[in-house]
Amino acid sequence: MSFPGCRPQALASLCFCVLVLACVVACQQEEPEGTLSPQPAPARSSWSLVPGKVKEWVEPLVNRTREKWKWFWGPTAFRGFMETYYDDHLKDLGSRARAWLRSSKDNLLNKAHSLCPQLLCRPSDQN
């Protein structure tokens, strides 16, 4: 059987497509519509194995590091660190802050007076 204006190669391709379509329709009709079949597990590619391998290599390293540094995060070491930090940096913070504010205020007033014209900001004893 030949169709007018069709090449033999096109006819073979058309027949193949019709055959595939018929197989797909037949396979869909074989399953009852009320039942759900479990989806097959996807084939595991080499990229899907990467997270497992990374976890396998990193987990022992993390566990060893955690064990070695457990003493640092204990209450005695941390308390000692905080006491030393307070003694070194925060003990006299209030007095240092007050002194800094005083000197900043004095510096700011001196700059303001230096920018002020002599006529407006003349000292009061020069009347």
From Swiss-Prot:
GO cellular component, one term: high-density lipoprotein particle
Family classification: Belongs to the apolipoprotein C4 family.
Function of the molecule: May participate in lipoprotein metabolism.
GO biological process: lipid storage; lipid transport; positive regulation of triglyceride storage; triglyceride homeostasis
Top-rank taxon, per record: Eukaryota
Subcellular location as annotated: Secreted
Expressed in which tissues: Expressed by the liver and secreted in plasma.
Protein's name in the database: Apolipoprotein C-IV
Pfam families reported in the protein's UniProt record: APOC4
Lineage of the species this protein comes from: Eukaryota, Metazoa, Chordata, Craniata, Vertebrata
Gene name per UniProt: APOC4
Transmembrane intervals: none
Keyword Ribonucleoprotein: no
